């Protein structure tokens, strides 16, 4: 293929492809995602037959025929270069080229010796035989039919992947998407996208509407066509759910649409929406709800979210009506206080007595208000005085960390809600058809419950089961959509017992947490330290200062970095979790002799890294917010001995979550993130010996009381706040963040 350089008349860089091979790798970035190399082109008429190529080189083997996709560019210092977007291996024609191609292909158990044997047997037909005639390959000594079949699959997939890469680049789409498309849609990936490119943004993880839209418009799809509007509406509602909302008003949808549709007016959107309404109404996953007393404008929602909110309200109200009467025992307080050694406050007594009377109850209160004391007293009364079998009492929490804390403070076995429901790859073992057998179920940290897990939980509750929810209504809402605890409390249909007395008044952390709730500036104590920087302080300097706190904390209090959690309001920015994670890791877990292990999206991992799961994975049994440590990083291994029957290992990462080790492929690590620093939202339900938090104007939208309160109450012994002039004051004046758009409270009140 002829290589061409750009002419001065060209107003924008044009995608080009050139054929050649790499002669020398000049530079590779630390994470292995960017390279500089010397190339030799096969086209003698190229503007430079030995150009420097820079960018994402997907293949780094030297002297292997490659096709480079990218753009010519003139660097002010280094001159003419080729900026690479993707590389695709080209099939060689000579025996030596085929041998080198096979030996560097990455195909399991196909190294240099085996490649020579194959080429000696099949010559220039070797690649075709590997792809189409595995039975001929299996006739060679030392190659089993099973291995030949695996090789056939490997090389057929390589062809498919390279075809997808080339096709995507026509539309200026990131070629890294090719592997995901092939994995999710198989050989039909290109046909699927051609039939409706908008499926990319609603069915493929990590692909936004802009990417799918760019491809669709390049393929000639109409700018205001029904397919575009339906896909946009679906995408916007899915994005709203990721931000916690269960519905959107027409005005919100229109504003969001205008941000994504270039060169389109509000009138255009309304006209296109009118034409698309039949298709929107016919879709099974989107729903328009007419105006009512709750949302006078009407609302758009995903059918699943609307169904869960309505269904959850019906189940809770039905449970209240159908539960058998509670035993009419009166609590013998002298006996219980003697048994537990606790003198209960009036509010605590009222809570225990109320919980015993009702089929469902809620206890809410901040740190130090006696929630744990009530739980211990309730469990003691049930087991010792009412002879309730301990096996019929289940304690659960949304995360493994919260469940472990619950077990430690109550002395009763606790588990995650997912384990309680016996999660499987395709659902839950306990559900509406097979309810949980327990008589009592107590769930702690219920502010973390999102709509989907609350829905799954209540579907598995039998009429005779008594349910107690415990949580702090002042904490941030769940990571997932909904505001379940707040909605249940606000509905007024469930008995709620609020605890307001602080029994830990000597704790500087607890005292200051309550000051934050009332909008009062915290005071410095032995347990709560903070430093205020001038407004506009250089964030790199702040980050450097934050890093010095890790050894200082160990020197002053004896807590190692494993016991310190850095919390930040947001992910991006100089003081966001992404930047902080890299900086903290390089300090506490620096790169060793082994190279970093590279996973999806160029993410890198090292043995010993603290990581968190960022999506629920029911098949693996790990869930959003779970924290683990990388225990083993397996790099690609090659086995080329004919007599060695071991199978080489694919790249994999082993992560220990508590007592469980979970294995991830490179592609699956898109579900993992470093967790040396994490968002305040992700830290819900956890408790750490030491918490360090930067709170700066960069995170203006997240400078509010719930964020500061939630972060502060995650600390058990020490909390350290780094802030900027005015930022804390703004947080204290902002009583709450953006209120989530949910309807569970309204449905509960009318169910």
Residue ranges and their predicted role:
Residues 341-357:
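N-terminal pre-P-loop "Q-motif" helix
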